[in-house]
Amino acid sequence: MNLQEIPTIATTEELIDRALRRASKVEESVRNADYRARLTAVRKIHSVADNIANPLHSYVKAFPSFDIIHAFDRSIIDLTVGVDKLRKALGASDWARKEVLMIATKYVPKARARKSAENTMKIMSEAYTKMTNVVRQIEKNLNFLISAR
């Protein structure tokens, strides 16, 4: 077990800002405006979901499994931050990752089905809002992981 290999954990706002900034760079070069809007919306939804889910997944995987670590290390972790609190925070991060991916899976077909660019952008905006709300729900858990690191 090497606790020094745990990556720097981003705050909720950093995570959201990074995901939205990277998604804003996604563009499609298709002549038909409505078709371009659909393709761009689909790629942007995937981009936001991936840029939120991947860091959350890396945070969960970076922490050691408490079932297989040495009892001494486990007791030190329990005394300093609390194993149960740490498990709860990691579980919340994993839940948020799954929820964000599920939202993307739900909204991509909706974005593809829209015919007009305006409706497609509304669907994309709705997906963004739901994904960012999920991340904001685990803000306390991410802050706990930052302090536990």
Name what the model sees in each region:
Residues M1-V100:
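N-terminal accessory targeting/assembly segments
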